[in-house]
Amino acid sequence: MKINNNFNIDSLIDNRDVAIVRGRKTDTFFKVFQVAPNIWIAPERYYGESLNINEDQKSDGGIYDSNFLSTNDEKDEFLQATVKILQRINNNVIGAKLLSLISTAIPFPYEYKPGDYRQTNYLVSKDNQHYYTANLVIFGPGTNIVENNAIYYKKEDSENGMGTMSEIWFQPFLTYKYGQFYVDPALELIKCLIKSLYYLYGIKPSDDLSIPYRLRSELNSFEYSELDMIDFLISGGTEYKLLDTNPYWFTDNYFIDAPKNFEKYKNDYETKIKNNNDIANSIKLYLEQKFKTNAQDIWELNLSYFSTEFEIMMPEIFNNALNHYYRKEYYVIDYFKNYNINGFINGQIKTILPLSKYNKNIINKPELVVNLINENNTVLMKSNVYGDGLKGTMDNFYAAYKIPYNIGDEYHINYSYLNNVNVEEINNIPPINDADIYPYRKNSDPFIPVYNITETKEINTTTPLSVNYLQAQVTNSNDISLSSDFSKVISSKDRSLVYSFLDNTIDYLDSIKYDEPIDTDKKYYLWLKEIFRNYSFDMTETQEVNTPCGINKVVPWLGKALNILNTGNSFIEEFKSLGPISLINKKENITMPKIEIDEIPNSMLNLSFKDLSENLFNRFSKNNSYFEKIYYDFLDQWWTQYYSQYFDLICMAKKSILAQETLIKKIIQKKLSYLIGNSNISSDNLALMNLTTTNTLRDISNESQIAMNNVDSFLNSAAICVFEGNIYSKFISFMEQCINNINKNTREFIQKCTNITENEKLQLINQNIFSSLDFDFLNIENLKSLFSSETALLIKEETSPYELVLYAFQEPDNNAIGDASAKNTSIEYSKDIDLVYGINSDALYLNGSNQSISFSNDFFENGLTNSFSIYFWLRNLGKDTIKSKLIGSKEDNCGWEIYFQDTGLVFNMIDSNGNEKNIYLSDVSNNSWHYITISVDRLKEQLLIFIDDNLVANESIKEILNIYSSNIISLLSENNPSYIEGLTILNKPTTSQEVLNNYFKVLNNSYIRDSNEERLEYNKTYQLYNYVFSDKPICEVKQNNNIYLTINNTNNLNLQPSKFKLLSINSNKQYVQKFDEVIISILGNMEKYIDISEDNRLQLIDNKNGAKKMIISNDMFISNCLTLSCGGKYICLSMKDENHNWMICNNDMSKYLYLWSFK
């Protein structure tokens, strides 16, 4: 799909791609630009809404400015920005398909008279002289400048399968943050584009089709938020997984009627349009492309899928319910500086955008104001709870909803993802000309604005709620004093006093109040290190508690952070006593679902045994599916009523983590700023302190991420525990009633049947009676998978702990050396470095002639607080080794280094103040492979070093402070030849168990496996199979007095499987490893050995000395298969030669014919 970017606001009117057109049902005119076939941009505020409305009509969280987008400069910026976002979408394969589909999805022509078809998707010029085909017009925002939406032209056509054109309101310049990342405007536009497809395809759900979304636990009344079905389908995310179930309990005729309506017009196209010569060929070609994609395909287009395809971060769960407790802030995007066709230039996290001037104009109409009052009714603090942007209802959906018996299995997810959209074919469709358009004048409804008017409710409480505690952790002051006394904080007039639950951190800050001032870099580093360590201990603490669902890692600070259970320090004890259900406020009884199960019709009473058996089995299967719908009714009630409350806690807890992180960072930054302005520390040291502090602030964010993950795990486990213990048991009880009734009716019916014997009746009863095993639907692992990773707020865009993963392999012309950590590492290396086979793959051969490899990326910088691990395989080829560098990251004699000395290795750490740690590792110069692991844990102030699977050093590094060095790691070979394999650096310490796992995993990977994944052994008897013919063993065939090897593909009973044995060149080896040199023998009356004949067939000989030695290796992708090679050629299976596929030595066959398996 080509996006036309050659426009500006002053482009001349050509009545083809640039025109002045009339708004529907109005006398408003505006300039439009066709940026893709049938897709237009109107750089104007949306004409259908007044730009000046009453205050009571303004929505909470909205921004209103009648002057926005009023000048030509602003309009041109809007045009260019929107084009760039469309180019970004088009730059991805699936994005290009989406735009192509919108381009082709013209509404079905209206049949004005029999055979007289007229177009409904058009714009008309000011003088009514020109018509322009339009499926979509993208406008600037309407009254509320931060509201994006898609609206239909004609409601009836948007729902009846005919389709109608669409208009979009869009704000490209303002975005907001979710957690730590900016929301990408491309995803915001994609959401509107998908919604437009529902209108263009005529498959829009009715406005009253909505589902309960979350229980509003912050209100005293029992109230739900409701989500429109179209938004539910488009949003994707975790909630969509509940729909991705067959069958799903929630049903409506929409999922039946929408495809039928669409198919009706598809059939009309085939019978009435396709061969109609009065309709322009371009229109028919567009319709032909449109009807290649059906309604089910559109249902599969959701934001989760596009975010994955575009690698865009987005909130994955409860999309519309995230901002209850804080006001969203907007940031300004500069499309020349911050954004290109790949998205934010520096990523969604690292990009820095300025706050918008409009933030001060955000409408503040909270859904609820919580007044915390004392015994004298004096208001101590006011806290706002904002709406979730959804309509609310007091109706109990579940009490009124009846689970249908005869419908509900029609909607299945098919995962087509626009496979039928052919972008190239669509690009070749000629444009629809002015003369091709016969307009239907009644193609639109008048646009009627809808205002979301919020009424603020107010409650008083003497018991502080979570929102009160959360508010007490936030301050705008730069002078900060932390206090763990909530009452003191809210009663104090001291604006610097802020509530904190970080007990260790507070105790440390209190303990140094009267110490000597911090006036040197060393004192600052000691202070900063202790702040970091105490923050980590406070924030990442968990305690294991036995619950009915097993051991649960509880986050003990949660009670103090949000006043949950009102228990202060006894949160753990109260949780043990009251269980996971105690964490939420509302514990409503599950509504027992209304069900309808058809009676067995009397018409079946006289059926034969065969027919009756078949009919009863069909009913049995249908009832079983119906039970599954009932199960999902219970699951959905838990999701909306219970899990929504746990998710609220997750959101608030994470907000609390970020609030505490902000407080600690402010304290650190204030201290550094003071030292920069008021100390006698040298400028060089201040510069180093500044760089080190930046890294420590990053490490603090990483600790916050660990805390967030702990919260996710704890509260999600608690929610699942409630489902398993409180909800599923009610489901079982309800099901027992259901099946007892069904079983009773089934028995009675079968007993009344007149055309079968008593034995046949007994057989049918046994076959069609339900037992408790038939409805065991609970799968805790599947339930856990709903929360596999979606709720974590990402701190870093790169989540892998690996900062370097060295790989090397041989290419035809050179050796490739690189990094597999996905950290954009820059690598420079000597071109004369050779590769040899190592422990598990190719290893670097550093021959001691000043060869080097240099790695650099943004993640290598060491500092004061970052933990890290280094591990690699080493084979030292030197003997009397003089001091020789091997690996290091040092600058100005600060950092870490590994070097050879005498007959061993030395690990050296030295900080910027000259504090040093040297650990000598002996016995690694014995010409053998060794696995070296070094773990630096700055929280425990511990250095661990392992050789192979043995811990050889456990040292304190308490005295080591800042080891800040450059972002370069060097791998050198000054004087000592050595092999290096698998050099890896992680941003975390390594445990003894992890070392053992890594060590033996690599060793295990070097072993060849048999067909059962067991290690292949020497001198053990096997049968041999080729991968392609996995059921046909290798046999011996005598031909011309020679014995050859082939598969038995003729079912010749005289051919028996041969018995193979692998013989090692090294008589002491038990197990076969990669690249071993082997001799293969075949057992029979006499032991024979494999040789290769002149025609390259494998033949058997009597003399072992004449046998060919073969190199054995495993396959990278199929672990229980292996390859055999001899003289640089692989052993494979030949194509069929008469009745035989021979084992031959040949490099010209298909890959899989080279794969073998010993059984």
From Swiss-Prot:
Pfam families the record matches: NTNH_C, Peptidase_M27, Toxin_BN_H, Toxin_R_bind_N
Organism phylogeny: Bacteria, Bacillati, Bacillota, Clostridia, Eubacteriales
Residues covered by region (Light chain nLC): 1-375
Gene Ontology cellular-component terms listed: extracellular region
Gene3D superfamilies associated with the record: 2.60.120.200, 2.80.10.50, Clostridium botulinum neurotoxin b, 'coiled-coil' domain (1.20.1120.10), Metalloproteases ('zincins'), catalytic domain like (3.90.1240.10)
Chain segments carrying region C-heavy chain nHC: 796-1159
Protein encoded by which gene: ntnh
Domain notes for this protein: Has 3 domains that are structurally very similar to those in BoNT/A; light chain (nLC, equivalent to the light chain), N-heavy chain (nHN) and C-heavy chain (nHC).
Cited function: Part of a botulinum neurotoxin type A2 (BoNT) locus; may be part of a progenitor toxin complex required to protect BoNT during its passage through the host gastrointestinal tract.
Protein known as: Non-toxic nonhemagglutinin type A
Family: Belongs to the botulism non-toxic nonhemagglutinin family.
Record keyword Manganese present: no
Organism: Clostridium botulinum (strain Kyoto / Type A2)
Keyword list, A-Z: Virulence
Residue ranges of the region described as N-heavy chain nHN: 376-795
Reported induction: The toxin locus has divergently transcribed operons maximally expressed during early stationary phase. This is part of the p47-ntnh-botA operon. The crude toxin extract was isolated from cells that had been growing statically for 96 hours (at protein level).
Superkingdom, natural source: Bacteria
